[in-house]
């Protein structure tokens, strides 16, 4: 492969998520964005409560009045006085530049919810422990390192949010807050979770994400009411078998740890719908995982797995997204075609797979995105033309030397990535892909482009960099929607006049065509052109001082010397990349 020169990555391709790592699209995060609202009781004070309704999948707001920047103008004493006089049950002092809480806070005995997000509090005063009715205490984004012991008096506390603080050790008092249902400790500096965590038997949501924890204690199995557990982005070296006792678990996030294996007991978590296993040290998966049939997104990217349990995929009846990237698969996952009947996204890039079996996607009527980039494929299966639901196909960085003519049946394709293969030509049937927006064939061995390319009227990005092209078809002028055209590092001797019809063209890369002696006058008709690269092109038909002046001067010269010198200057490329 040749090193590509004279190009810059465009945000257009990145936004399509073709060359990006797909793992993040399926990453799991426990829903700990804000404190969980407490149960609403019917009492005369209910009219003084402000409740927050959180829709599934929508990031909840911690407070009703959101302050985008810290406000030193807020008079905390007046807020507390007002709260006391009204007998309010909720106080929001979030993002108010608070450093010290006043002692009169203890007088707010009716308070049920206290929000102190985004302040500068380093020490929580013991007065907070004197709020007997407090159910929600939100302290995210402060400078706390510990908590006062008398918080143990908060016998009604259900939600404790300590995200984004400076806690190195979980304060002992937390292990005594036995009424907690929600505990968020993510983004701290915690290295140890003591066995006292087992005391919090009512916990439903626990987040320890982004800490420095190595060992998850076995008593985690005593938290039988857990619904979501997020211990991702730590240094966890084991998952205790007792995790199987948490039978109400629906979301378990273990990604970015050092876990070498999963216990068989994980198969008891039959309510689970989300399981995050990305970037661990897993070399295999237990057969019992097939019992977790409700999982809809299965992502094991970045492990050492070479094969899946035989019946696993067939058992995941709700599976819509499957990511097996960056493992050690040498063969396609075994199993009948029905295992993909609900799958819409299948990503298996960066493995060692040599073949996609015939008929494997016969039942995959919803499959819209297939990424098998960076494997060892030499061809595509004979039934390739039956993958008619595909919208995005990425087979880059393989050893494919020929595309099947049946590609004409993939009429829903919008993105086709074929870069870094061994293709010498494209089938004429490619002209049938009328919805295609991105066609990337960089670093192949193409000697020509079929004239049928003219039918790709929806095409916006065409990448032909680093091939063996001696010319471009005149029909390229029909591609009036193309904004990005890269034909650098080829063997072009000319550019067709019809390029002037590409009215949407914004970026044109002609760099490193060592036989390119001239440019057509029609380039001046590309009124949207902003960037043109002509680096390392001789362009001997033009005056050397003009070429040395760069693309802007070249365009001006073509305009003045050609038949279009009476036209209004609608745009001149300003840079040579």
Swiss-Prot record:
Molecular function in Gene Ontology: volume-sensitive anion channel activity
Stated name of the protein: Leucine-rich repeat protein soc-2 homolog
Biased composition (Basic and acidic residues): 1-10, 33-48
LRR repeats: 87-109, 110-131, 133-155, 156-177, 179-201, 202-223, 225-246, 248-269, 271-292, 294-315, 318-339, 342-363, 366-387, 389-410, 412-434, 435-456, 458-479, 481-502, 504-526, 528-549
Pfam families from the UniProt entry: LRR_14, LRR_8
Presence of the UniProt keyword Repeat in the record: yes
Presence of the UniProt keyword Ion transport in the record: no
Organism: Nematostella vectensis (Starlet sea anemone)
Keywords assigned: Leucine-rich repeat, Repeat
SMART domains: LRR_BAC, LRR_SD22, LRR_TYP
Family: Belongs to the SHOC2 family.
Region (Disordered): 1-71
GO BP term, pick one: intracellular signal transduction
């Amino acid at each position: 492969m040749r090193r590509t020169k004279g190009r810059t990555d465009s945000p257009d391709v990145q936004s399509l998520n073709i060359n990006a790592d797909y793992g993040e699209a399926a990453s799991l995060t426990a829903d700990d964005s804000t404190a969980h609202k407490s149960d609403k009781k019917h009492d005369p004070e209910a009219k003084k409560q402000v409740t927050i309704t959180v829709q599934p999948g929508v990031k909840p707001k911690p407070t009703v009045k959101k302050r985008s920047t810290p406000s030193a103008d807020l008079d905390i004493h007046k807020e507390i006085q007002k709260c006391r006089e009204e007998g309010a049950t909720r106080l929001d002092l979030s993002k108010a530049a608070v450093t010290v809480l006043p002692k009169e806070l203890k007088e707010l005995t009716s308070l049920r919810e206290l929000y102190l997000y985004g302040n500068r509090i380093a020490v929580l005063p013991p007065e907070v422990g004197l709020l007997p009715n407090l159910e929600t205490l939100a302290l995210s984004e402060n400078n706390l390192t510990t908590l006062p012991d008398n918080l143990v008096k908060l016998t009604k506390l259900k939600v404790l949010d300590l995200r984004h603080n400076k806690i190195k050790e979980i304060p002992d008092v937390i292990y005594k807050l036995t009424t907690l249902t929600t505990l968020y400790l993510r983004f701290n500096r915690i290295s140890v979770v003591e066995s006292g965590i087992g005391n919090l038997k009512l916990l439903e949501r626990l987040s320890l994400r982004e800490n420095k924890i190595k060992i998850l204690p076995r008593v985690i199995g005593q938290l039988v009411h857990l619904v979501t557990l997020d211990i991702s982005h730590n240094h966890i070296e084991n998952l205790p078998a007792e995790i199987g006792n948490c039978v109400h678990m629906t979301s378990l996030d273990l990604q970015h740890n050092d876990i070498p294996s999963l216990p068989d007991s994980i198969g008891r978590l039959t309510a689970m719908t989300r399981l995050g296993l990305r970037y661990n040290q897993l070399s295999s998966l237990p057969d019992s995982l097939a019992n977790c049939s409700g999982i809809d997104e299965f992502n094991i990217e970045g492990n050492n797995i070479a094969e899946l349990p035989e019946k696993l995929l067939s058992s995941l009846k709700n599976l819509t997204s499957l990511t097996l990237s960056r493992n050690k698969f040498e063969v396609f996952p075994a199993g009948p075609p029905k295992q993909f009947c609900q799958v819409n996204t299948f990503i298996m890039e960066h493995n060692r797979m040599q073949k996609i079996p015939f008929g494997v996607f016969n039942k995959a009527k919803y499959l819209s995105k297939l990424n098998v980039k960076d494997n060892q494929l030499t061809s595509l299966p004979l039934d390739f033309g039956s993958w008619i639901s595909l919208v995005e196909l990425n087979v880059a960085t393989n050893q494919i030397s020929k595309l099947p003519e049946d590609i004409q049946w993939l009429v829903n394709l919008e993105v086709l990535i074929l870069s870094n293969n061994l293709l010498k030509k494209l089938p004429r049937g490619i002209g049938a892909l009328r919805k295609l927006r991105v066609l990337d064939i960089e670093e192949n061995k193409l000697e020509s482009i079929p004239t049928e390319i003219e039918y790709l009227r929806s095409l916006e990005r065409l990448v032909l960099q680093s091939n063996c092209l001696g010319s471009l078809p005149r029909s390229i002028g029909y591609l009036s929607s193309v904004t990005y055209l890269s034909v650098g590092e080829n063997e072009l001797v000319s550019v067709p006049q019809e390029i002037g019809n590409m009215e949407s063209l914004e970026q044109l890369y002609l760099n490193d065509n060592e036989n390119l002696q001239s440019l057509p006058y029609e380039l001046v008709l590309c009124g949207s052109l902003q960037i043109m690269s002509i680096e390392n092109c001789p362009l001997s038909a033009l005056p050397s001082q003009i070429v040395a002046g760069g693309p802007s001067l070249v365009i001006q010269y073509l305009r003045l010397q050609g038949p279009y010198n009476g036209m209004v200057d609608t745009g001149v490329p300003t840079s040579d990349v």
